[in-house]
Amino acid sequence: DTVRRVPPVGIAISESVRQELSAEVKALETNLAEARLRWSRNPQQLKHWADIAIFGKSVDWALRYREIFKTNEVDSARLQLKTAAERLQALDKGQAPWTEIPGPSVGGYVSRIDGSVQPFGLVIPKGWRPNSGRQWRLDFWFHGRGETLSELAFIADRMKNLGEFAPADTFVLHLYGRYCNGSRFAGETDFWEALDEVKRRYPIDENRLIVRGFSLGGASAWHFAVHHASQWAAAAPGAGFSETA
């Protein structure tokens, strides 16, 4: 009883709101399961199903584990479920516009660790066009510590904000890394899996990979810079601890 809970318990929401969101999550899960059967013979559709599933999971977990920390996160939950429904409709038509429109976006992949869907944020550069024939620089941004950084909050931020750095002609991958663990343990594996997913989707120049982060994210950047130095063109850790060597 004397140990402080991390993350803390979220705010109370009305039972009507809880039932509303829970019903929408259940409907999304049913619709997505049916869609996956329709897409089973079309790899181009099936490969994007996790881009939809991340929204249902984020809302489900926020409700299940009481991780709604601000009143405006209820609206974020509604927006994410609406976005999931729109993506499902688009993918039914063989379209995935969120993977092509420049600016901030979110995607997902299935983790080899436990089969869960995991979210990532991605900033698509303005100059990018499909089949352009060029390779692109990729920067990574590791987030700092945030006790209320649920998947719901992470996705909400990554849907609308470019982030701390958005260099020109550069993709920027924002890692969630399973909350705030400094990209250790499962968070470290998530880094490599998210990188693999982005490389499958976009022509990334492996000679121009840069790791960045601040605070706990600086510790993450330092960790990868030290242990995998040959992988990066540069590293920019800020205000992170350096006991990873």
Predicted features, each with a name:
Residues 1-11, 65-136:
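A domain-start/cap signature at the N-terminus of enzymes
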Residues 30-33, 37, 60-68, 86-93, ...:
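Sec-exported extracytoplasmic/periplasmic mature domains
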Residues 1-52:
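Amphipathic, heptad-repeat alpha-helical segments
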Residues 42-70:
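Amphipathic, non-membrane alpha-helical rod segments
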Residues 230-243:
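A conserved short beta-strand
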Residues 127-134, 183-216, 226-232:
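Gly/Ser-rich "nucleophile elbow"/oxyanion-hole loop immediately N-terminal to the catalytic nucleophile
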Residues 220-224:
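Hydrolases whose catalytic domains are alpha/beta-hydrolase-1, hotdog thioesterase
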Residues 133-202:
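Active-site machinery of serine-nucleophile hydrolases
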